[in-house]
């Protein structure tokens, strides 16, 4: 039997992304560490339960999510999915979206340079999708494997409308105050508090006039992260300020 890693400190923080869902090892780890007396906190975790395996379709309808029992193993769980029913049942859960909202790049004022920009998941490139409108290739494109964060943000901000199959592309575009159209190839897309227009890739041009903006999104996201930070600091007895 493999030995499970035991952190050297009693407070463990799990950060980021779709760690809750199929084929995720999170529940195994949280249960063991809970039995060993660790305090566990989840920051910006989220659903990743259902996936569309058809790379041509890249669309999954809104599906009821069943969260695993391991979410009760956390002393505090900040989850990026905005499901009020979950928070009403599991009291240790609060809405905490990705902490990348704190980055100073979102405080810069960017000029809109083009009507549309595309931001694609590197494992789901749009050039493999049949039936995409010809107009798709008339606009700037960037992949989510770009390592320069500021370049990514400048690219997203340069468009009036962002078309993407990247979860974070949709999230960051919303924080920038842009209109967003996203292709929900995974159930995680349906958990956004500030929802983009969700459609099949072939339908993006039909939806071009549909998106709205959420001017409150950046401040709501930052406030949620700051409040969660102080909750954790209070729990672990560290009074260090931001």
Please give the residue ranges for each predicted region.
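Active-site anion-handling motifs in enzyme catalytic cores
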Residues: 1-242
């Amino acid at each position: 039997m493999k030995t499970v890693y035991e952190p050297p400190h009693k407070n463990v923080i799990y950060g980021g992304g779709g760690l809750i869902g199929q084929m995720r090892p999170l529940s195994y780890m949280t249960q063991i560490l809970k039995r060993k007396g660790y305090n566990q906190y989840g920051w910006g975790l989220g659903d990743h339960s259902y996936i569309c395996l058809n790379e041509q379709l890249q669309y999954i309808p809104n599906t009821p999510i069943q969260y695993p029992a391991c979410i009760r193993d956390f002393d505090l769980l900040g989850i990026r999915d905005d499901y009020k029913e979950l928070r009403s049942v599991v009291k240790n859960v609060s809405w905490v979206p990705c902490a990348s909202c704190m980055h100073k790049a979102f405080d810069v004022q960017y000029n809109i340079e083009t009507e549309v920009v595309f931001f694609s998941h590197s494992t789901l490139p749009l050039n493999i999708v049949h039936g995409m409108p010809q107009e798709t290739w008339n606009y700037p494109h960037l992949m989510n494997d770009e390592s320069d964060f500021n370049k990514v943000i400048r690219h997203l901000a340069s468009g009036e409308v962002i078309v993407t199959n990247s979860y974070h592309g949709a999230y960051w575009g919303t924080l920038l105050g842009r209109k967003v159209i996203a292709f929900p190839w995974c159930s995680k897309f349906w958990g956004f508090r500030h929802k983009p227009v969700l459609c099949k890739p072939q339908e993006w041009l039909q939806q071009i006039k549909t998106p709205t903006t959420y001017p409150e999104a950046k401040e709501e996201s930052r406030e949620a992260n700051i409040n969660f930070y102080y909750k954790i600091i209070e729990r672990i007895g560290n009074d260090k300020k931001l």
